[in-house]
Amino acid sequence: MEDMLSFWDVAIYFSAEEWECLGPAQWKLYRDVMLENYSNLVFLGLASSKPYLVTFLEQIQEPSDVKRQAAITVHPGGKCYTCKECGKGFEHKKVYQNHRRIHLRVKSYKCEECGKSFRFPSLLSAHKRNHTGQKPYNCEICSKAFHVPSLLSVHKRIHRVQKPYKSEDYGKTLHCPSLLSQHKIVHTGEKPYQCEDLGKAFRYPSRLSNHKKIHTGEKPHKCEVCGKAFDYPSRLSNHKRIHTGEKPYKCEVCGKAFHDPSKLSQHKIIHTGEKPYKCEVCGKTFHYPSILSKHKIIHTKENLCKCDICGKAFHYPLLLSQHKIVHTGEKPYKCEDCGKAFYYPSRLSRHKKIHTGEKPYKCEVCGKAFYYLSILSKHMIVHTEENPYKCEVCGKAFDYPSRLSNHKKIHTEDKPHKCEVCGNAFCFSSSLRKHKIIHTGEKPYKCDICGKAFGSPSRLSKHNKIHTEDKPYKCEVCGKAFHFPSLLLVHKRIHTGEKPYKCEVCGKAFYCLSTLSVHKRIHTGEYAYKCEVCGKAFHCLSTLSVHKRIHTQEKPYKCEVCGQAFHASSKLSHHKRIHSGEKPHKCEICGKSFYYPSRLSKHKVIHTGEKPYHSQASGKTLDYPSRHSKPKTIKTGEKPNKCEICGKAFSFPSLLSIHKRIHIGEKPYNCEVCGKAFRNPSRLSNHKKIHTGEKPYKCEICGKAFDYPSLLSKHKIIHTGEKPYHSEVCGKAFSYSSRISKDKKICTGEKP
């Protein structure tokens, strides 16, 4: 034990002449250093009893009193080793050599685990216990264990409720003098320890040392279960509870339990509603000082570090350095499993969870688990339906402030991100990146099940749910389920009738914003998405994607009942109603039901008598746009869809598909009453009217009823006497187009 340090080995000695030269500043420095040296010895367990001189210093005596006490207590004789730097004397050579390391800053004792160095072997021994987890010093009252005896001594004061060190300003009492010194800094607001990289300041050197590990990336404490590394042993301890499921910190108000005490402290503020940290500029209050610090940057905008390439500004040089990597394209952090590279190590850490399947954050309401806490927080809003952030222009509410900020750009029409290829502009840079994939054709994200490729990982994630059929979001009104909460929200508007998105040109309203965006292109005439095969242009990308399947003959959506395949999922959904007999769209006037809303809209024209579509070719007004567009196709003679067997051509691919069934003999649509089969669903629908005797289309003049609107239209010509169809051979006029074909054969002498 003779080689162990004592208080007198690290004490500062002054001669009588030197004491007389000390001014108030030097006296204060002497006092602080002496108390700090004693605190270090206590921490290492090397102080058996408190010297009387230390008691004097703690009680803040006058310099003259301390001078007398130092002269009595400190013995100058018997010290053969004198330090040249500070004049201090030592009896033993080894103690003198250890003392010299303080001036030379030599740290000879290195930790083999993490590489950290120390001046004394006793400090290294105490440090090693952090790695081994050894805590040999136990509290006799509560059995809590500690690495070093000094921490045990401080802990014991909790049981004795002994706090001998009192703050003069606020009267707060503390267990030890070092805590009192630290506490005083809180009142002064002083942060003397500054980070050279980020500029961030701290009250204590220990906090600065901890902070520096962010820049160095040092994480010596590794989890044995999942391999995740941490910068501090306390964080590793908290992390381990994720695997064990242990939540020892419980809220007294609501009973919610947490892994670590800091999370509990944060949670408690929810119940109290306390926001003690106020912004001096705008008066906004916050729960935590860290959030206030981040908020203050909005007002200051000082000392911004600007990017030379794009001009983007940052508050800290570290953030600028991270940003510059985006321009260089360098992605130094690579995933060992799939080879994907990232700009930042944090992004790589998040990505790795996909491979490990670790989803430590679980929803207490529905049991769904998530990779990240932030995504769980977002998910919880689905259950609460809380949308606290409201748009001042249109009144729409959002769950997050970032989504409100993005939404506001719709009203300002500010689209700073422009595509260099086609000139299309976007509100957000992310939207521009997604758009560029259209021009490059790049689809790096592939589905493992069906092999389908996508331009973005989010699209692949959405697609994967088709295979799993996991639809956790259910409508309370009709029971329909959805993959995503956003789709459920849009669907609910069908029941409520809410259409918040209105077209400024024609006044038409829509359930969702994307439908309004597509609709607007009708007025602008914008067809941004063009088919490379046939040159046909479309308003939106999804319509182009569906159209391309006509050329590739790809039909990924198959009916489980009859095996018929379709280009688009919407077509399959419509087709399924034929088998189920579901007709959800009902006419309010006559009660007739339809499979599709478009059919109901067409049907309503019969009751209103409205004919809004005008044919430029014949000058006639028509009740349906199809009657206007189909004659145009016939007139131009355009029939691009040709049958490979007989060579017959058709205007539309749907007609070609129906025609092909003649050759293969396929009749997938069966009548449930008589068993008769048909090639297409419209023929089956017409046939069913024979059994029901239904004739919903009635002539207003003579009262005659018909099965179909086409027969009613033909019948009306009898009353009007109109003959719009002229023979090119003899010039004779006819009421029906079919009569022209018969007349041609009579005039030419052709025998049918």
UniProtKB/Swiss-Prot annotation:
InterPro entries the UniProt entry points to: KRAB, KRAB_dom_sf, Znf_C2H2_sf, Znf_C2H2_type
Residue ranges, annotated region (Disordered): 611-636
Keywords, comma-separated and alphabetical: Metal-binding, Repeat, Zinc, Zinc-finger
GO BP, one annotated term: regulation of DNA-templated transcription
SUPFAM superfamilies (UniProt xref): beta-beta-alpha zinc fingers (SSF57667), KRAB domain (Kruppel-associated box) (SSF109640)
GO molecular function, one term: zinc ion binding
Domain named KRAB: residues: 5-76
C2H2-type zinc-finger residues: 81-103, 109-131, 137-159, 165-187, 193-215, 221-243, 249-271, 277-299, 305-327, 333-355, 361-383, 389-411, 417-439, 445-467, 473-495, 501-523, 529-551, 557-579, 585-607, 641-663, 669-691, 697-719, 725-747
Disulfide bonding pattern of the chain: none
Family matches, as Pfam families: KRAB, zf-C2H2
Leader sequence residues: none
PANTHER family given in the database record: KRAB AND ZINC FINGER DOMAIN-CONTAINING, ZINC FINGER PROTEIN 737-LIKE-RELATED
Protein name: Zinc finger protein 728
Organism: Mus musculus
Species lineage: Eukaryota, Metazoa, Chordata, Craniata, Vertebrata
